[in-house]
Design a protein with these regions (language model features):
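Long, low-complexity, charge-biased intrinsically disordered regions
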Residues: 1-282
């Protein structure tokens, strides 16, 4: 039984933003309705009958599924397989770097799209191909055309003449509310420069599940907040088992983002091919 379904890497999304900014391409957003009902099962799957079919159930009869359903382990894999086959049939190539990335290149015209479960981001310098693809997908699947991209995976996207900014303002506010730190005093930095965390039991162990969930959510936030990436990387080294001082360090990060929740990652439109490199090592 195959249950694996690839997930798009978020750094691919950042490449999308940089590419479309500098080439002046549009970013289109589409959503697939009832995603997992579109998959074709590769194996035979049977389910028990509903209670209304009491007589048939007593006779030992069961239902054979013709399509995938929500709740089946195979559903994500089955859905993605069907979606990928549809794109291959329309002349799209699946990228080796990221299997959720598809592209079509013909006569200097390029169309690129990526998919995350039921969300599709599409960009192109070929309006005709872009609209044709939308029509083809809408014929095969129930689709909702959301127009220009504004939000994707809780990442807010804003575009201007100067470039594209991505942020997670609502995500930050929800995280602060969840941790009851919406009213906390903001910190000036995510971590003190001389912070040295230890694994020695000094303040007692913390709730491992809560600590790991918080760090996981902060890791996701770091995709648009590179300024807190180092601090998050450091506290993520103490997942087994977390201690009191480790949770205090996490709270310090939360206090920092309380005062900076409006920050965003900006992709500026640039001219030329000058490459700038920054490093903190030789």
């Amino acid at each position: 039984m195959k249950i694996f379904a690839p997930i798009v890497k978020l750094n691919i999304g950042r490449v999308f933003f940089s590419l479309t900014t500098n080439l002046d391409w549009t970013l289109q957003h589409m959503n697939v309705k009832n995603t997992f009902l579109n998959g074709n099962l590769e194996e035979e799957v049977y389910i028990n009958l509903l209670l209304i079919f009491d007589k048939e159930s007593k006779d030992g009869k069961v239902c054979k599924l013709r399509k995938s359903l929500y709740g089946l382990k195979q559903s994500p894999h089955a859905w993605f397989n069907r979606f990928a086959k549809s794109l291959h049939y329309q002349g799209y190539t699946q990228a080796n770097l990221d299997h959720m990335l598809f592209y079509k290149h013909k006569n200097e015209k390029v169309t690129i799209l990526t998919v995350y479960v039921d969300d599709i981001i599409l960009t192109s310098n070929d309006k005709g191909e872009r609209e044709r693809l939308k029509e083809k997908l809408a014929l095969e699947f129930k689709m909702k055309d959301l127009g220009s991209l504004h939000i994707f995976l809780e990442i807010e996207v804003a575009r201007s003449r100067e470039g594209i900014s991505i942020s997670q303002r609502k995500y930050v506010l929800d995280l602060l509310k969840e941790t009851s730190m919406i009213g906390c005093k903001p910190a000036n930095t995510p971590m003190d420069p001389n912070t040295k965390l230890s694994t020695k039991l000094a303040q007692g162990p913390m709730n491992k599940g809560r600590y790991n969930r918080l760090v996981g959510k902060l890791i996701y936030l770091s995709h648009t907040r590179s300024d807190i990436a180092f601090a998050i990387s450091y506290v993520s080294q103490f997942m087994h088992p977390p201690l009191g001082e480790h949770m205090e360090a996490v709270h310090k990060i939360l206090r920092d983002i309380k005062g900076t929740f409006g920050r965003s990652l900006f992709f500026r439109k640039t001219m030329g091919n000058n490459i700038e490199v920054y490093t903190n090592a030789d």
